[in-house]
Amino acid sequence: MTIMIPAWVNGTLTSVEKLEAHVKGLRHKAVSVFVLKGDAVLMQQRAMCKYHTPGLWTNTCCTHPEWDEAPEVCAIRRLDEELGVRGLIPQHRHHLEYRADVGGGLIEHEVVDVFVAEADETLVVLPNPDEVMAVEWVHFDDLVDQVAQHPDRYTPWLRIYLRDHAATIFGELALL
């Protein structure tokens, strides 16, 4: 199945095949979500069948919006598709851009809308094995320490978010 994503080609936003966008390092739209439960972050380990960064740990979920799909709608859709999570209302926290080598000759050059959703003890997480190998709740301070000690276990974008954007994304958690 060919997946088309919104990407800029010669300054014009157009629909581009997802793999082509990553091979060429085209600037493209993306959405990232962090689900928090108190001071813990719901992390996922990417499935081994993913075409880039398989097996690495990353934020709760991330994706590319469909053409004309609002970022908020995309965030809710992807929480359900990747993790079976329903009923959360992600709040927009940040808009950022980054470029990172994700291995295998692929480049992520994303313009990202970042969302945070608050969960409670009743949250049900049912990972889709085509997307997610494992999930884990990690206290924010422990996450920062783990990423610093073992950066190769985490996606490049998560490392960028924590290094350059933690205060904006996580607010008080990042300031403690």
UniProtKB/Swiss-Prot annotation:
Binding of Mg(2+) occurs at E82
Q: What is this protein called?
A: Isopentenyl-diphosphate Delta-isomerase
* Cofactor(s) the record lists: Mg(2+); Mn(2+)
Q: Which SUPFAM superfamilies match?
A: Nudix
**Annotated EC:** 5.3.3.2
Q: Provide the protein's localization.
A: Cytoplasm
Catalytic residues (positions): C62, E110
Q: What does this protein do?
A: Catalyzes the 1,3-allylic rearrangement of the homoallylic substrate isopentenyl (IPP) to its highly electrophilic allylic isomer, dimethylallyl diphosphate (DMAPP).
Q: Which family does it belong to?
A: Belongs to the IPP isomerase type 1 family.
Alphabetical GO biological process terms: chlorophyll biosynthetic process; dimethylallyl diphosphate biosynthetic process; isopentenyl diphosphate biosynthetic process; photosynthesis
| Pathway it works in | Isoprenoid biosynthesis; dimethylallyl diphosphate biosynthesis; dimethylallyl diphosphate from isopentenyl diphosphate: step 1/1; Porphyrin-containing compound metabolism; chlorophyll biosynthesis
The protein's UniProt keywords, in alphabetical order, are: Chlorophyll biosynthesis, Cytoplasm, Isomerase, Isoprene biosynthesis, Magnesium, Manganese, Metal-binding, Photosynthesis
Q: Which GO terms describe its cellular component?
A: cytoplasm
Pfam families in UniProt: NUDIX
Reading the lineage from the top rank, the first entry is: Bacteria
What catalytic activity does the UniProt entry give for this protein? isopentenyl diphosphate = dimethylallyl diphosphate
The record lists Mn(2+) as bound by H22, H28, H64, E108, E110
Molecular function terms from GO = isopentenyl-diphosphate delta-isomerase activity; metal ion binding
